[in-house]
A protein has these predicted regions:
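Conserved N-terminal/central alpha/beta ligand/cofactor-binding core
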Residues: 5, 17-19, 79, 85-86, ...
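N-terminal export leaders
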Residues: 11-18, 23, 27
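A short, basic/flexible loop-to-alpha-helix module at the beginning of a structural domain
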Residues: 46-61
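Beta1/beta-strand and adjacent pyrophosphate-binding region of the FAD-binding site
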Residues: 59-70
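N-terminal Rossmann-fold NAD(P) dinucleotide-binding loop
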Residues: 73
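Conserved beta-strand-loop-beta-strand element in the redox core of flavoprotein oxidoreductases
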Residues: 175-194
Length: 502
């Protein structure tokens, strides 16, 4: 049922892209050759570098270093390794998947663009099936998954491709030589260390690697300076989902509920005045003083496949006065958001049928940042590209998710069947020659980013970043000089729908 993008591809190329030919690529006795990883544990010549007045060890010397193990970064690492590059993936947590796993952002929204699934995205969905998680509900096009299963799948994909994962490693800084990054500095469980690489991919979501290297960037809405609001998502267990379904779909006759358990969701969005039936319930809570207007503004919940009686809560939406790009404000948002979370949960337990025995079973390990920093790259995507449904010869994916700018009075949709494309040039900058940026922090305006930020699109961008990194290294082409449309079609994850309109 999922969207699928098909390109002509030779069997051998397909095997390389899906990791079947990855075995044996990482060999310690050939450090320095393409497709190898040299680690401090088995290669003394990795040595040390001087940083901040002291010598620190070099943990890895690799072809490609990816910072950030979210949807984009994981895809980039897997595809770089599958295409022959020795690859290290840095992740600050203890699981890959980013917001999908650590942030409770669930499920994957649909791009609404026909044939948008690139091979990597289609593979993730198929692997969910192989693990007993059917991602489609038969009605909607969103991808239902299971966070813990998804983390396992990403581990498996990295292991099969030969990606070295460095968990609990926080990116600290970069080391530059001219217009190239030569190493990044990370804080590990053992202290500061360096990773040398020929090409670096920023999958941090916050453009941290790019900013540390001196790439130009911007943040927030050009008109107000505000970031999109943060969320502090959580899960609730002990829910009688069938009772909840009967109440919402039968008693309230909420026609918005298209699917039924085990695939079921509820929602209300008072701030958008969409007149969901549950808005009345939340409004009564405001009137009685049980919850605040801020807490009642937005509430959404989804059942989680493989977790009976558990729902993923897409709330609270933290007020826009808290910033995703200010460390002090962000920290205060955590405290404020947790209070909102408990108020909402307590109110639902008291007032929403089916929640009588519910409880908070898990809170996200990171806030949900919809938007923070974005690079200024060789092509700057704007809302004009959205409205014009722009096509590019170097397009790496397509999407049609609506302009979903929380906190601003902006919400627009393309006509059915419409879409725009994202060019490779939006992933690279003029200033840093061996840097590729993947995910929600690519070169785009605030409004356009509100459309391309969803996880399947970020996966496709990361997929292309990994392919491009490996291809450029194999031909000694700088990352910011790569012509995506010069890569043979059979090796690309996406081929533009048509010649560029611009």
């Amino acid at each position: 049922m999922g969207n699928s993008f098909e390109i002509p591809i030779a069997r051998r190329d397909f095997m390389e892209m899906t990791g079947m030919a990855a075995a044996g690529r990482i060999a310690a006795d050939t450090a320095g050759e393409p497709g190898t990883v040299s680690t401090a544990a088995d290669k003394k010549e990795n040595g040390t570098i001087k940083y901040a007045g002291r010598e620190i060890p070099v943990l890895y010397s690799v072809d490609v270093c990816v910072a950030g193990g979210g949807p984009a970064g994981t895809a980039a690492a897997v595809m770089a390794a599958r295409n022959g590059a020795g690859t290290v993936l840095i992740e600050r947590g203890v699981a890959l998947g980013g917001l999908a796993v650590l942030g409770c952002v669930y499920p994957f929204m649909d791009t609404h663009a026909p044939d948008s699934d690139t091979p990597y995205v289609a593979e993730v969905k198929e692997r969910l099936r192989q693990h007993g998680i059917e991602p489609f509900d038969g009605v909607t096009q969103q991808t239902w998954h299971n966070p813990e299963t998804l983390a396992l799948i990403y581990d498996e994909m990295c292991a099969e491709a030969g990606v070295e994962i460095l968990y609990q490693a926080v990116l600290v800084d970069t080391v530059l030589a001219g217009h190239a990054i030569t190493a990044c500095i990370v804080q590990t469980i053992a202290g500061l260390a360096a990773i040398r690489a020929k090409t670096f991919i920023d999958g941090t979501g916050d453009a941290f690697l790019a900013r540390a290297a001196g790439a130009p960037y911007e943040r927030g809405y050009e008109k107000t300076g505000n970031n999109q609001p943060l969320s502090f998502r959580f899960e609730m267990g002990g829910i009688d989902v069938e009772r909840l379904y009967r109440y919402v779909a039968v008693e309230l006759q909420e026609d918005w509920c298209k699917s039924r358990p085990p695939y079921f969701e509820i929602a209300e969005a008072m701030h958008r005045k969409q007149r969901y039936k549950l808005e009345e319930l939340m409004a009564r809570g405001v009137e009685s003083g049980e919850i605040t207007q801020e807490e009642a503004e937005y509430m959404q919940a989804y059942t989680i496949i493989g977790k009976n009686g558990v729902m993923s809560m897409n709330c609270p939406e933290i007020p826009v006065r808290f910033s995703a790009a200010d460390p002090v404000s962000y920290s205060k948002a955590v405290t404020y958001g947790r209070k909102m979370m408990h108020h909402i949960a307590d109110y639902l337990i008291r007032r929403l049928p089916g929640f009588e025995k519910a409880f908070i079973s898990r809170e996200a390990a990171m806030l949900g940042a919809r938007e923070s920093w974005r690079i200024r790259g060789r092509h700057y995507l704007t809302e004009d590209d959205y409205h014009d449904q722009s096509r590019f010869p170097d397009a790496v994916c397509r999407t049609a998710w609506f302009i979903d700018a929380h906190g601003e009075k902006v919400s627009e949709k393309l006509p059915a069947g419409g879409f725009y494309e994202i060019p490779y040039r939006s992933l690279v900058t003029e200033e840093i020659e061996n840097l590729i940026v993947a995910g929600r922090c690519i070169s785009a305006s605030f409004i356009l980013q509100a459309s391309m930020r969803i996880q399947p699109t970020c996966m496709s961008i990361g997929e292309a970043a990994g392919i491009a990194a490996a291809w450029g290294l194999s031909r000694n082409i700088a990352a910011n000089e790569i012509k995506w449309d010069a890569i043979p079609a059979g090796k690309r994850s996406y081929v533009s729908a048509e010649k560029a309109k611009k």
